Amino acid sequence: MAVGLGPLPALHPVPGFELGISSAGIKRPGRKDVVVMRCAEGSSVAGVFTLNAFCAAPVILAKQRVQGTVRYLLTNTGNANAGTGEPGLVAARRTCEKLAQLTGVDASAVLPYSTGVIGEPLPVEKIEGALQAALDDLSVDNWAAAATGIMTTDTLPKGASRQFTHDGVTITVTGISKGAGMIRPNMATMLGYIATDAKVSQSVLQDLIRDGANKSFNRITIDGDTSTNDCCMLIATGQADLPEITEAKGPLFDALKKAVFDVCMDVAQAIVRDGEGATKFVTVEVNGGGNQQECLDVGYAVAHSPLIKTALFASDPNWGRILAAVGRAGVPDLDVSKIDVFLGGVCIASQGCRATTYTEEQGSAVMAEEEITIRIELGRGDCSETIWTTDLSHEYVKINAEYRT
């Protein structure tokens, strides 16, 4: 069940960025599970990657190659090529070499990405056999098809698009993502691809995707697990007839930053809305922190708590579980007598105790909604952070218990 996530919005084509989809039958015969993306010559490419120590073979290669000349991005679903050791690296290189051979580029110009089951050998021959069909399918209009092609346990494709005008020239930013479980990005299973036709230097582009991911992909969590394969890529094709952005300042940069951040936020929140088994979309706001980190610590303590997440699923306003999570978040010298907690607009705890105005009926009414905000006021300073998460349902357990069957 996707919470408040409807059909894909219009995904505007990005000049200089093409996508092609084909079937390798990695997990299911006939399933479109290979996506090739082609960047125009001269494009800048930047990315952020998982910090999981068991990062997948394609992540290792993509991190090594991203600052060089990049022409193609190759994604397969159904197999993560993680936990596969040196043979996994060999397999990832082979798929890149085959695509390079078919297109006449150097193998180092191909960045690989994989998502799916961890620990199984990558079916190289199947992927190689699907590459020509993906190349034949390349089109700037294939964003929606690619959004479907990168899905695993997702129930709906995810994408967003923005356009703005600068000096009479229209700039486009379009992105897609996948992910529904094993979601607590930290680079940053989550993959994101965003492209723009603006011309941007690689260093500025890298800072842009790092900051954009930090405020979006790095603020979502479904189950607290950081995948071995997480990455988010930002490509600037430079096809728009405007000067290159070489500094993080000025009206053009500011407009591009807003568009990129908006797309990041949309596709990141779409991952939460489509979380495995999710029936609630939950915003955890933490205000009044002494610093950003303690706000994040409190937010994640609440967002990761199985007791809170199951209470959300049951629409049970068990506010004591929220207080307990705040108390164990590790905030030094926390004065609980200054803490207020709200469910939606209802104050459920004031100065560390049940609010005198609170009734169970008020809490139950808020918890029955599909979209819920938990707001925590720490009373320690001026810092704030926001995390987005889900409830924890029977369906989440079922999906993950049956994942390999």
Swiss-Prot record:
Cited Pfam families: ArgJ (PF01960)
Catalytic residues of the enzyme: T189
Record site: Involved in the stabilization of negative charge on the oxyanion by the formation of the oxyanion hole: T115, G116
GO biological process, one term: L-arginine biosynthetic process
Location within or outside the cell: Cytoplasm
Origin superkingdom: Bacteria
Xref: InterPro entries: Arg_biosynth_ArgJ (IPR002813), ArgJ-like_dom_sf (IPR016117), ArgJ_beta_C (IPR042195)
GO CC annotations on file: cytoplasm
Statement: the UniProt record of this protein carries the keyword S-adenosyl-L-methionine: no
Molecular-function annotations in GO: glutamate N-acetyltransferase activity; L-glutamate N-acetyltransferase activity
Catalytic activity line of the entry: N(2)-acetyl-L-ornithine + L-glutamate = N-acetyl-L-glutamate + L-ornithine; L-glutamate + acetyl-CoA = N-acetyl-L-glutamate + CoA + H(+)
Record keyword Amino-acid biosynthesis present: yes
Enzyme class: transferase
Membrane-spanning segments: none
EC number: 2.3.1.35, 2.3.1.1
Record-linked HAMAP family: ArgJ
Membership in a protein family: Belongs to the ArgJ family.
Subunit organization: Heterotetramer of two alpha and two beta chains.
Matching PANTHER family: ARGININE BIOSYNTHESIS BIFUNCTIONAL PROTEIN ARGJ, ARGININE BIOSYNTHESIS BIFUNCTIONAL PROTEIN ARGJ, MITOCHONDRIAL
Protein name as catalogued: Arginine biosynthesis bifunctional protein ArgJ
Originating species: Pseudomonas savastanoi pv. phaseolicola (strain 1448A / Race 6) (Pseudomonas syringae pv. phaseolicola (strain 1448A / Race 6))
